[in-house]
């Protein structure tokens, strides 16, 4: 039986584009109805689209596969936004008030609007996280109703390049599917991975991706810092491949033998051992360990630097939470503790939301953002026939789409024909004007020549010659 009430979520990852359809239950759990994925490494890098056409093809393929599983047409989807250019910046807006003015919601809204209007070069604000409001000597999160003569709002703005969102819009416009809403990927991931206690006590959420690592710092249930580091698990694979291995071999060596942290050993057997990949390639164990650990240490050092930059490095009572595909690398938590001295670490390979249904998602930390997008969606994404007020069947929807595509193609051809006709008419008029101009110039030149000839041979010219002749005679001079 076809599903007619569901939510669809799409995540644009650097290794694959994933799509999911599900239905929310009354108890807060989600029933998974469909799942699809397509490789995206040749069209998305570090979370940003760089090939619009290939991304459009991948998106179309993913959504079509979801439709086939659902046996129902999809009208719109919810999309996650992330990537290297996403980061947080702090801003302060203040307003002088009359004496003992009661702060209203309208006043708070106006301060927030002023914050959104700050000038940014090649950037746009994707989300705003109010930090607190300074009223008198107090810092409040909910200042409405408090009398004051001055208020100062502190905001954390999440910004990104204009092209990040505009490229996504272009791709979905080409697919013919609507975007119900855009969600900031780090925020929705935190919604389904972090507990209320962790958010309140203070914690750092580290999402280890393929091309990027995202750092989100929370305290008192408020996002305090967000940064994206341009390093991920794929960098480890590339480092291994630099030892003259194919990419697939490097990935397999990492997955089968890689470790983020290894205890030093003086045992000769341990020192001289090697790793063999099904007889295809061999690498000394110590060499592989050094390669993996060096890159992991670099990533963790950058992560820790961002946590310290946030100003909350010593306030993370809730510890650190890991998620993302790189969490499958053994001893990642030990490596983090070795560098940062933080021991309270939790690895979240699945979300806090209960999932049900016949479709089982990978429990490796790679699907948490997708689940977060799905959980944040609210509207039914099934296509509805506006004439009947009911959901179209999959076949009817395909027929309607084909008819619509045919109509648009005919309109396009008519438009092109009209443009061609107008261009030909404009060209014809141009040629006529040019011919008129040429003929007018020829007539003008002819009149000029006739005038010059007249001046040389006409009556006036003859009279002038007689006067000159008589003058020469009177002066007894020989005519020239």
Map each language-model feature to its residues.
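Phosphate-binding glycine-rich/basic clefts of nucleotide- and phosphate-handling proteins
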Residues: 68-69, 83, 126-128, 135, ...
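Residue-level signature of catalytic and energy-coupling elements of molecular machines
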Residues: 9-10, 19, 79, 172, ...
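Nucleotide/phosphate-binding catalytic cleft detector across ATP-hydrolyzing
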Residues: 1-16, 20-203, 260, 384-480
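A short acidic Gly-Thr/Ser loop motif
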Residues: 10-16, 81-82, 205-212, 218-221, ...
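Glycine-rich phosphate-binding loops at beta-strand->alpha-helix junctions
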Residues: 259-261, 316-337
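ATP-binding/phosphotransfer module of carbohydrate and carboxylate kinases, centering on a glycine-rich
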Residues: 310-311, 331-344
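Short glycine-rich phosphate-binding loop at a beta-alpha junction
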Residues: 72-83, 310-325
